[in-house]
Amino acid sequence: MKERWEKTFSQALDREMEFGVFGDDTAEKLCLAFPPQNGRFYDFHNFGMVETAAPWIEAGKLQIVCPDGIDGETWSDENGDPQYRIELQERWYHHIVDELLPPFARAGGKAMVCGCSMGGVHAGNFFFRRPDLFDMMLSMSGLFNGQYFFHDYMDDLVYANSPVHFLPNMPYDHPWMTLYRQSRIILCVGQGAWEEDLLHGTWELDAILTAKGIPHWADYWGFDVAHDWCWWQKQFPYFLEHLFPIEQNAG
């Protein structure tokens, strides 16, 4: 499998940002894979997630790009100034959609977003904010309420990064609703150790999508399924097989 590690200067963040790329630029689908909370661009590779996707990468079905994160300065910095934190988060959002994504974008095609834990939070935010850019979302052990991280603080940017707040207020005939209904949306969460908050967060979004008539797949795994890499390593290829079936050679 082709892999490369790169860095680029982000005008949005005024700093260098690193990322990993796995697979060929001619692959059918681009997938942005976000790291877990406070994680780095190499985590998806180092914890074996890229390896579980090798059959799809090698078959030319998928190219995975792993951005770097700044959660420690934004979502996780609960003692920091909330306005500064969410404004910095918005600058990171623009780094992803305006700087990182365009060189990899396929002509006439949209990308996929995925992630586990905080990566699943990011996947949800990018997908629901920009269904004009993304038409597949796989969130493993994510949640979708910005106030989980910002508590009593709310402004227009926290709202924009909180699908459980803005989706209920979106009119049924909003143009984004049509794009959501044309997309593939997968939510997955375990019911075991350390998944309690994520389970509630998945239920919350599941109910909103159902009420809005947005097709989706909410998959609740067993009570032995914990918030851990060993389970995400099982979930990722399981869902890739549903999204990108690989034909088996007969005989």
Q: Language model features by range: what are they?
A:
Residues 1-251:
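Non-catalytic cap/lid and distal C-terminal segments of serine-dependent acyl enzymes
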